[in-house]
Amino acid sequence: MNSLLFLALVGAAVAFPVDDDDKIVGGYTCRENSIPYQVSLNSGYHFCGGSLINDQWVVSAAHCYKTRIQVRLGEHNINVLEGNEQFVNSAKIIKHPNFNSRTLNNDIMLIKLASPVTLNARVATVALPSSCAPAGTQCLISGWGNTLSFGVNNPDLLQCLDAPLLPQADCEASYPGKITNNMICVGFLEGGKDSCQGDSGGPVVCNGQLQGIVSWGYGCALKDNPGVYTKVCNYVDWIQDTIAAN
């Protein structure tokens, strides 16, 4: 991967210098249906994650954009029909108007579902932030992305990772000149645990609120290169206004 360029991998958090390193590494298998807001974006295969924020809208990363998406909800094993899933096609897919595919600033996208989903114990919404979370807040990251830092192991079962929101100064020091005010770092400077390919667009939930969207990083789970996430608290007005207008 060109170290001078960001590469938005289809179905992946943007990661370099290693293409195959964007997944949840060092996490654990989530308890079945314990993450009812987690969705899988599918175009014949799982390519990104997302979060259900009301019965007809999903939020994901803009670098996951495709013209047609099937949203799969109530999933745990994405390769087996378990009987609890709901599959709904997209009606509208709206990238943030200021999304920059080179810098990945404003890496956020809304998907309107063709019909409302049925909310239940296995399909539920996650709250938008009421305020921005402070550094040190413990968060939960989830996804079906690769589980290896080197090599590929795409899991069938949803994976989880508990990780702290890092100080912005540490985030900026890890990626000099790359971090905007719309980005946060979540994870471990010592490496070993991170999101990776296939997790992109998925949730970072802190104290029951969606504070982050899996966006990009340098490799996966590498020392001094924590995962970078879209700072959702900066976009609550845009989300609400866009939903109201559509």
UniProtKB/Swiss-Prot annotation:
Site residues (Cleavage), renumbered to this chain: 81, 122, 150, 193
Regulation: Activated by autocatalytic cleavage. Cleavage by CTRC inhibits autoactivation.
Propeptide: 16-23
Residue intervals of the Peptidase S1 domain: 24-244
Known tissue expression: Expressed in the heart, lung, brain, kidney, liver, epididymis, ovary and uterus. Expression in the testis is limited to round and elongating spermatids.
Coiled-coil regions listed: none
Localization in the cell: Cytoplasmic vesicle, Secretory vesicle, Acrosome
EC number from the UniProt entry: 3.4.21.4
Main location group: cytoplasm
Active site: 63 (charge relay system), 107 (charge relay system), 200 (charge relay system)
Disulfide cross-links: 48-64, 139-206, 171-185, 196-220
Keywords attached to this entry: Autocatalytic cleavage, Cytoplasmic vesicle, Disulfide bond, Hydrolase, Protease, Serine protease, Signal, Zymogen
GO molecular function: serine-type endopeptidase activity
Any GO BP annotation: proteolysis
Catalytically driven reaction(s): Preferential cleavage: Arg-|-Xaa, Lys-|-Xaa
Family: Belongs to the peptidase S1 family.
Function: Serine protease capable of autoactivation.
The protein, known as: Trypsin-5
Organism expressing this protein natively: Mus musculus (Mouse)
The gene coding this protein: Try5
